[in-house]
From Swiss-Prot:
It is a peripheral membrane protein. The N-terminus might form a beta-propeller domain involved in specific binding to phosphatidylinositol 3,5-bisphosphate (PIP2), leading to the association of the protein to the membrane. The L/FRRG motif is essential for the cytoplasm to vacuole transport (Cvt) pathway, for the recruitment of ATG8 and ATG16 to the PAS in nutrient-rich medium, and for its recruitment to and dissociation from the PAS under starvation conditions. Belongs to the WD repeat PROPPIN family. This is Autophagy-related protein 18.
Length: 469
């Protein structure tokens, strides 16, 4: 019998379980110790999501059809059909969010009643995050961009144009899933978003744009920028971001073979201001006179700016400008400004290498925010090198999600931190599950301690463990 094709990989909300959707059903594993606790041959499962470690799972077996199933009882709780393909499912103990390309359906998970339908800009990558927390129950997604042109000149028989168009900037809308109101807009990046993640307590939001060089962390819902990290110099597509349960580390995987681990906060665990300059992560304080919570909108939500220059428009630069001062091809400054910016950034870079972090933090606190971010770019605290697969990776399932690799594409990965030890778990699109140890004192390169396959046909990973009631 041929090996099943891998369609979907996801960790549950506390990283204690791993759910895998394949062309021949789905499997659920414990992550510590690694063991298979449930398997089903329900058909071609393109999406699967768990509700913590309970027996409740959400399944997509056909593009527009969602099934909520109790795996312990082997029963279907409910079935829902949508007007277009379901691209993602998010859930916590109070809410279920179903993401379509241009809509998000929000349900009360207690009785599966529809609470709200959110119109969005075209979102083919299903960029959406729902807080695992029931208390801070926030939904984050790209801010819809209204269409500016009107239908006045269109023929009367022509279908109406969509209300929203694809985003051109990386603004994030924060939606309270309990009160069903939009509460803030975080202007996170100049270019469109590629990945967002919310921590377990629903208090932090990590964002990455299509450029993928800068990772930012904001408070939720106020939108204060706390950390800004540099993933790398060259553009890269971010596949996965995940906080550990204590929100002290952030893991990021991308098209490169490197998983980056960033440290959030120092001894004071992320206090803002100059005190954070000595930590591994760059803590960004508000500039004098800057309202860190954003000015409230009169109609629907407040808005928090997070671009490095308060008078720059969202589309006027790239991620490279945000931290290194380098011009983007679309928006190059004058030659004089380019020389001045480059020489000044070089001076700062050399100075920061000579002076200690404490001195840099003190001097940086007197500089404008843009210069402060140039002063001390925050790199990763630790990193992991994913082994290159020698097996050919083919995309044989036409109904599979875009998270799978096709021939010639780089290996894709999903990452999470262990809840009980300083270990990073990495699952790759060729069916490998890796566990790496991280030195929490010195950081540096993590080392591989365990490796498993999630596509094997044998039962050596079977376990008698059961779910929560």
């Amino acid at each position: 019998m041929a090996t099943a094709t891998l369609n979907f990989i996801t960790f549950n909300q506390d990283h204690g379980c791993l759910a895998v959707g394949t062309s021949r059903g789905f499997r659920i594993y414990h992550t510590e110790p690694f063991s298979k606790i449930f398997s089903s041959e329900d058909g071609n499962v393109s999406i699967i999501e768990m509700l913590f470690s309970t027996s409740l799972v959400a399944l997509i077996l056909s593009p527009r059809h969602l099934i909520i199933q109790n795996t312990k009882r082997g029963s279907v709780i409910c079935e829902l059909t949508f007007p277009s393909a379901v691209l993602a499912v998010r859930l916590n103990r109070k809410r279920l969010a179903v993401v379509l390309e241009d809509e998000i359906y929000l349900y009360d998970i207690a009785n599966m009643s529809l609470l709200f339908t959110i119109a969005t800009s075209p979102n083919p990558s299903a960029i959406c995050a729902l807080s695992p927390s029931s208390e801070n129950c926030f939904l984050a997604y790209p801010l819809p961009k209204p269409r500016e042109d009107k239908d006045d000149k269109r023929p009367s028989h022509a279908p109406p144009l969509p209300t929203y168009i694809p985003p051109t900037s990386g603004d994030v809308l924060i939606f309270d899933a309990i009160t069903l109101k939009a509460v803030n807009v975080i202007e996170a990046h100049r270019s469109p978003l590629s990945c967002i993640a919310i921590n377990s307590e629903g208090t932090l939001l990590a964002t990455a744009s299509e450029t993928g060089t800068i990772i930012r962390v904001f408070t939720v819902p106020k939108g204060q920028k706390l950390y800004q990290f540099r993933r790398g110099t060259y553009p890269s597509t971010i596949y996965s971001m995940s906080f550990n349960l204590s929100s002290t580390l952030l893991c990021v995987s991308s098209t490169s073979d490197t998983v980056h681990i960033f440290r959030l906060g120092g001894p004071n665990n992320g206090a803002s201001g100059a005190a954070g300059a000595g930590s591994a992560g760059e803590v960004l304080a508000a500039s004098p006179g800057q309202d860190i919570t954003g000015s409230p909108r009169a109609d629907r939500w407040s808005r928090s700016r997070s671009y490095d220059s308060g008078n720059e428009s969202p589309g006027s630069g790239s991620e490279a400008n945000d931290i290194a001062g380098s011009p983007s091809p679309r928006d190059r400054p004058t030659a004089a400004n380019r020389r001045q910016s480059g020489s000044f950034s070089n001076i700062l870079r050399r100075s920061s290498q000579i002076m200690g972090r404490s001195v840099a933090g003190v001097v940086g606190s007197y500089l404008p925010q843009t210069v402060t971010e140039m002063w001390e770019p925050a790199r990763d605290f630790a990193f992991i090198k994913i082994p290159k697969s020698s097996a050919a990776r083919q995309h044989n399932n036409p109904g599979a999600t875009p998270s799978l690799p096709i021939a010639g594409e780089p290996l894709r990965s999903v990452v999470a931190m262990s809840s009980s030890s300083p270990q990073v778990m990495v699952v790759t699109s060729d069916g490998k599950f890796y566990v790496y140890n991280i030195n929490m004192e010195t950081g540096g390169e993590g080392y591989l301690v365990r490796q498993y396959s999630i596509l094997e046909n044998d039962d050596k990973h079977d376990s008698s463990s059961t779910y929560e009631s």
